């Protein structure tokens, strides 16, 4: 009864108004699972390939009809007849069908859609929540949200270098209270910005994107908003950054537009060390460029015992790149984005490898998101303890927060929210 009888893909829109792939998987008993694939703005060079049509006459070249056709014409005939609960077999079949190291033939957006829709169909068939289907009976940790409330870099049209300034309600007793704290600081920040005559327009992920003179000015505004909301920075709420430093890296140097500085890798490490002394930072993501391995090693040796160092573009959810990082002693945490690698099975394998090496895992959205809330379930399924899914605004971000509220309510007394302990430093 859990046999796949049909697979259908279509072109839909993401939160930026760009086309993306939606896949529906139908089972013999009438069950259907649906998944919509997100996309990134600052994408790592080593990510699996997101297939775009390149036809300038449709969606400015960003159409995904080729990926849709790859699902309907190539993948569907092969997976029809398979058992939806055989996730590993289905994912491996698609990897073999593609037969490229980065899923360039069929597209990670095609493969991921089928992979996640299959998992959702199987969970629905078994009449259990998706997080329980993926993670089993021990899936009960609700992640601490890292909420992007102020945007710079590629996520905003302003002069701030750092891409994401996040608040982390690490002092909350549970997820629902942590979310409330984050929402109150978010609205407090809007009021602070308006009072100072600064813009309160939002970036791709719902965070505000005012024109500010420096990265430090952004952090100072957030500290002011935390205090105005009645919370204590450093205990109730901590800060986290996603620098997306690959976007700043040119000709072997880091170019900070806001200050006009051009810094070496070691000077960037000094920059972060000084920032850590001044602000209650507990997580730093993509502090150096995706191929600056020597710089990353310096950063980890100097600050790895003081702060969570997250590799996103560096690792791209890829177990081979993570293995190199573990071997070289680089980072102590990995960002997990399913569409960077393309299948649920490979994602879970990477998480397991990270865990064995003592790395923390942060489950993440993309800047181009949808109403799909699967990553909320994945975060709980894997007991990751941390999630990045934007500001508490815009329905594409709030969909994940609302799903986590439902899961926490469903788990009731069995739900675990570790707060600051999820960061291990």
Swiss-Prot record:
Cofactor needs: Mg(2+)
EC supergroup of this enzyme: lyase
One GO CC term, this protein: cell surface
Leader sequence segment: none
Biological processes per GO annotation: glycolytic process
Active-site residues annotated for this sequence: 205, 337
Enzyme Commission identifier(s): 4.2.1.11
Cofactor binding note from Swiss-Prot or TrEMBL: Binds a second Mg(2+) ion via substrate during catalysis.
Entry GO MF terms: magnesium ion binding; phosphopyruvate hydratase activity
Localization, UniProt: Cytoplasm; Secreted; Cell surface
Keyword field: Cytoplasm, Glycolysis, Lyase, Magnesium, Metal-binding, Secreted
Gene3D superfamilies: Enolase-like C-terminal domain, Enolase-like, N-terminal domain
InterPro entries (alphabetical): Enolase, Enolase-like_C_sf, Enolase-like_N, Enolase_C, Enolase_CS, Enolase_N
Reactions catalysed, as given in the entry: (2R)-2-phosphoglycerate = phosphoenolpyruvate + H2O
Ligand binding ((2R)-2-phosphoglycerate): 163, 337, 366-367, 388
Superkingdom of the organism of origin: Bacteria
Binding site for Mg(2+): 242, 285, 312
Pathway noted in the entry: Carbohydrate degradation; glycolysis; pyruvate from D-glyceraldehyde 3-phosphate: step 4/5
PROSITE patterns with a match to the protein in the record: ENOLASE
Family classification: Belongs to the enolase family.
Task performed by this protein: Catalyzes the reversible conversion of 2-phosphoglycerate (2-PG) into phosphoenolpyruvate (PEP). It is essential for the degradation of carbohydrates via glycolysis.
The protein, known as: Enolase
Organism in which the protein naturally occurs: Syntrophomonas wolfei subsp. wolfei (strain DSM 2245B / Goettingen)
Taxonomic classification: Bacteria, Bacillati, Bacillota, Clostridia, Eubacteriales
């Amino acid at each position: 009864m859990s046999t796949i009888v049909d697979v259908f893909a279509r072109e839909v829109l993401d939160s930026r108004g760009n086309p993306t792939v939606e896949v529906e998987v139908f089972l013999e008993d009438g069950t259907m699972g649906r998944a919509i694939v997100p996309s990134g703005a600052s994408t790592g060079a080593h990510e699996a390939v997101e297939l775009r049509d390149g036809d300038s006459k449709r969606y400015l070249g960003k159409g995904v009809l080729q990926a849709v056709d790859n699902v309907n014409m190539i993948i569907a005939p092969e997976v029809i007849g398979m058992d939806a609960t055989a996730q590993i077999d289905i994912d491996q079949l698609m990897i073999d069908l593609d037969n490229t190291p980065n899923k360039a033939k069929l597209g990670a957006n095609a493969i991921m859609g089928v992979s996640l829709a299959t998992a959702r169909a199987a969970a629905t068939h078994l009449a259990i929540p998706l997080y329980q289907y993926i993670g089993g009976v021990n899936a009960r940790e609700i992640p601490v949200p890292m909420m992007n409330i102020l945007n710079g870099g590629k996520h905003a049209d302003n002069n701030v270098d750092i891409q994401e300034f996040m608040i982390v309600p690490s002092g909350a007793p549970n997820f629902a209270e942590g979310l409330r704290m984050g929402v109150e600081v978010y609205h407090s920040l809007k009021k602070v910005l308006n009072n100072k005559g600064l813009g309160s327009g939002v970036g791709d992920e719902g965070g505000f994107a005012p024109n500010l003179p420096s990265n430090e000015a952004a952090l100072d505004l957030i500290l002011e908003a935390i205090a105005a909301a009645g919370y204590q920075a450093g205990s109730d709420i901590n800060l986290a950054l996603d620098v997306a430093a690959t976007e700043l890296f040119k000709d072997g140097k880091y170019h900070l537009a806001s200050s006009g500085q051009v810094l070496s890798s070691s000077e960037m490490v000094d920059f972060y060390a000084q920032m850590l002394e001044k602000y209650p930072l507990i997580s730093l993501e993509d502090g150096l460029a995706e191929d600056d391995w020597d710089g990353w090693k310096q950063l980890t040796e100097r600050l790895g015992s003081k702060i969570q160092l997250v590799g996103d573009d560096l690792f791209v959810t890829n177990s081979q790149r993570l293995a190199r990082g573990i071997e070289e002693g680089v980072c102590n945490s990995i960002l997990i984005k399913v569409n960077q690698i393309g299948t649920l099975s490979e994602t879970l394998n990477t998480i397991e490898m990270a865990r064995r090496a003592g790395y923390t895992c942060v489950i993440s959205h993309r800047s181009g998101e949808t109403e799909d809330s699967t990553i909320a379930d994945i975060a709980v399924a894997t007991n990751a303890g941390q999630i990045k899914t934007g500001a508490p605004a815009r329905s594409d971000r709030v969909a994940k927060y609302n799903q986590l509220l439902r899961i926490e309510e469903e788990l009731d007394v069995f739900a675990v929210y570790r707060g600051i302990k999820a960061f291990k430093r």
